[in-house]
C-alpha cells in the first residue's frame, strides 16, 4: 500500500512541476508573439493531469467580457503553436493545451460585495434596528448559486458550527468559494473534472 501512495505522490509532484514549466513557456509565448493581439492576459493557474497528457490553462483578461472572449478565442486558435513550443520540455508525450477563463476573481468580487452587505446587516441588527431583508444581496447570492449549481457534481456540503445563518464567507485554501446558507456551507473547490 505504501508503494501505491508513493507512486501517486510522485505523479502529483511531476504534474505540479510540469504545470510550472508549461505556465512559464506559454506566458513567454504570449508575451513575445501575441502581446499586441491579446492585451493584458494573465495566466492564473495551470492544471496538468497525472499522466501529463493534458494541461488546462486558466487565464484572466483585463477588459470587458467581449474582450475576454476575443482573447480566449485567439488563445484557442493558437493552441497548436503553444503545443509546438512545449516540445522543448523533452517529454515522451507533449500535453494538449486547453484554455479557460478564470472566474475566480469575478466570483470573489461578488462574494466581497455580499460579505460587505452582511456586515452592514449585522451592524443594523447589533444596533437593534430591524429592517427589511436585503433583497439585492439575496438576488445576488441566488445568481452565484445558480451559476455554480449547473455543475452539481462539484459541490460539496458540510455543516458549519456558526449559529449566524445569514453570514457569508470567502475561503481561500485551494481556491474554493464558500457561502454560508442555512447553517450549511456550500463549497465549490476548483478541482479537475472527470476529463482533467
From Swiss-Prot:
Assigned GO CC terms: cytosol
GO MF term set: ribosomal small subunit binding
Entries under Pfam families matching the protein: RBFA (PF02033)
Cited SUPFAM superfamilies: Ribosome-binding factor A, RbfA (SSF89919)
InterPro entries: KH_dom-like_a/b (IPR015946), RbfA (IPR000238), RbfA_dom_sf (IPR023799)
Subcellular location: Cytoplasm
Keyword Cytoplasm in record: yes
Alphabetical UniProt keywords: Cytoplasm, Ribosome biogenesis
Gene Ontology BP term (one): maturation of SSU-rRNA
Description of how the protein assembles with itself and partners: Monomer. Binds 30S ribosomal subunits, but not 50S ribosomal subunits or 70S ribosomes.
Function: One of several proteins that assist in the late maturation steps of the functional core of the 30S ribosomal subunit. Associates with free 30S ribosomal subunits (but not with 30S subunits that are part of 70S ribosomes or polysomes). Required for efficient processing of 16S rRNA. May interact with the 5'-terminal helix region of 16S rRNA.
PANTHER family referenced in this protein's UniProt entry, alphabetically: RIBOSOME-BINDING FACTOR A, CHLOROPLASTIC-RELATED
Similarity comment: family membership: Belongs to the RbfA family.
Matching HAMAP family: RbfA (MF_00003)
The protein, known as: Ribosome-binding factor A
Gene this protein is translated from: rbfA
